[in-house]
């Protein structure tokens, strides 16, 4: 994600030596995920996610469109990612490589869209003619590693928070009701995939399988930006609370055996379970807050009448 950043030899040596002695610069253990802060905006589908110094914003929107000819009973779902120049000095002056956005967008798309997390059949209005087109716009605001994990959390939280306008169909006429007239309708979410990224280090500079004969390779969860710059391999796994492996992405680096992959999936599950529960709890609190505000507004209007 940040190939153009240079890190000094002394700092690189210090970080790797700390890892050899089971220490990380931010004080976390190797299997510890950063605390995730999820904030919902005033509008449905407006979500900000903060992991350490990494900040991601996601905005879910929808409009009526025409479905694909080969999928007349399904709606449309598109994910768009954009790295803002304010995300870090490495992205200033338009120095944003297409590979960064494509890699992140591809993994998020496999994790969310292709896994069927969103019920696209529920977006159909008139088969073969009209459907809802849902769009997730992800903006990276601050970069300190973990972009993929943070953006996946933001997209799923946004989809679960978003509500589309209610509609009435009379023949070929479609009436879209304003939110202040009719209660908007939530999207159909079939499961909640969450990404967890593992970074691998080879301090001995000897190429072999991860956890090979010397057993010297180091693996950590949720690397910071500086740790990402020094890693020798990376693995992103996506699971849901049902213990289903949604996708596995490994873009080169140190070779890996099946046992290590199984171990990573097992470690990721406890993190995914915690984040899923956190999203559900925050959604519940946000719904209660909105209902309370709506009740107060209704009572005030009744008094005025």
From Swiss-Prot:
GO annotation (BP), single: nuclear polyadenylation-dependent rRNA catabolic process
Localization, UniProt: Cytoplasm; Nucleus, Nucleolus
InterPro entries membership: ExoRNase_PH_dom1, ExoRNase_PH_dom2, ExoRNase_PH_dom2_sf, Exosome_comp_Rrp42_subfam, PNPase/RNase_PH_dom_sf, Ribosomal_Su5_D2-typ_SF, Rrp45
Recorded GO CC terms: cytoplasmic exosome (RNase complex); exosome (RNase complex); nuclear exosome (RNase complex); nucleolus; nucleus
Gene3D superfamilies recorded: GHMP Kinase, N-terminal domain (3.30.230.70)
Keywords: Cytoplasm, Exosome, Nucleus, RNA-binding, rRNA processing
Pfam families listed in its UniProt record: RNase_PH, RNase_PH_C
Superkingdom per UniProt: Eukaryota
SUPFAM superfamilies: Ribonuclease PH domain 2-like, Ribosomal protein S5 domain 2-like
Keyword Nucleus (UniProt): yes
Assembly with partners or alone: Component of the RNA exosome complex. Specifically part of the catalytically inactive RNA exosome core complex (Exo-9) which may associate with the catalytic subunits RRP6 and DIS3 in cytoplasmic- and nuclear-specific RNA exosome complex forms. Exo-9 is formed by a hexameric base ring of RNase PH domain-containing subunits and a cap ring consisting of CSL4, RRP4 and RRP40. Interacts with LRP1.
PANTHER family (UniProt xref): EXOSOME COMPLEX COMPONENT RRP45, EXOSOME COMPLEX EXONUCLEASE RIBOSOMAL RNA PROCESSING PROTEIN
Miscellaneous comment: Present with 4800 molecules/cell in log phase SD medium.
Family indicated by similarity: Belongs to the RNase PH family.
Function summary: Non-catalytic component of the RNA exosome complex which has 3'->5' exoribonuclease activity and participates in a multitude of cellular RNA processing and degradation events. In the nucleus, the RNA exosome complex is involved in proper maturation of stable RNA species such as rRNA, snRNA and snoRNA, in the elimination of RNA processing by-products and non-coding 'pervasive' transcripts, such as antisense RNA species and cryptic unstable transcripts (CUTs), and of mRNAs with processing defects, thereby limiting or excluding their export to the cytoplasm.
Designated name of the protein: Exosome complex component RRP45
Organism this protein belongs to: Saccharomyces cerevisiae (strain ATCC 204508 / S288c)
């Amino acid at each position: 994600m940040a190939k153009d950043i240079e890190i000094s030899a002394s700092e690189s040596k210090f970080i790797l030596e700390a890892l050899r002695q089971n220490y990380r610069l931010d004080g976390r253990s190797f299997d510890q995920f950063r605390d995730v802060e999820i904030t919902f905006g005033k509008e449905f589908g407006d979500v900000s996610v903060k992991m350490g110094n990494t900040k991601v914003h996601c905005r879910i929107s929808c409009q009526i469109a025409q479905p694909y000819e080969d999928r007349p009973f399904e709606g449309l779902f598109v994910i768009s990612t954009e790295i803002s120049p304010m995300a870090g000095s490495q992205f200033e002056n338009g120095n944003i490589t297409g590979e960064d956005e494509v890699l992140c967008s591809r993994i998020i798309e496999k994790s969310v869209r292709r896994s069927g997390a969103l019920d696209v059949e529920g977006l159909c209005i008139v088969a073969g003619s009209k459907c809802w087109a849902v769009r997730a716009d992800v903006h990276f605001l601050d970069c300190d590693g973990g972009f993929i994990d943070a953006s996946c959390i933001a997209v799923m939280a946004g989809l679960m928070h978003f509500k589309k306008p209610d509609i009435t169909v009379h023949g070929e006429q479609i009436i879209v009701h304003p939110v202040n007239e009719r209660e908007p309708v939530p999207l159909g979410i079939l499961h909640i995939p969450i990404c967890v990224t593992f970074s691998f280090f080879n301090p001995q500079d000897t190429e072999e399988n991860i956890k090979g004969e010397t057993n010297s390779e180091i693996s950590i969860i949720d690397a910071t930006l500086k740790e990402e710059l020094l890693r020798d391999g990376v693995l992103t796994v996506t699971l849901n609370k049902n213990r289903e492996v949604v996708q596995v992405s490994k873009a080169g680096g140190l070779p890996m055996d099946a046992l290590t992959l199984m171990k990573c999936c097992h470690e990721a599950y406890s993190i995914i379970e915690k984040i899923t529960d956190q999203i559900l709890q925050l959604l519940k609190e946000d719904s209660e807050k909105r209902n309370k505000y709506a009740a107060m507004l209704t009572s005030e209007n009744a008094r005025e009448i």
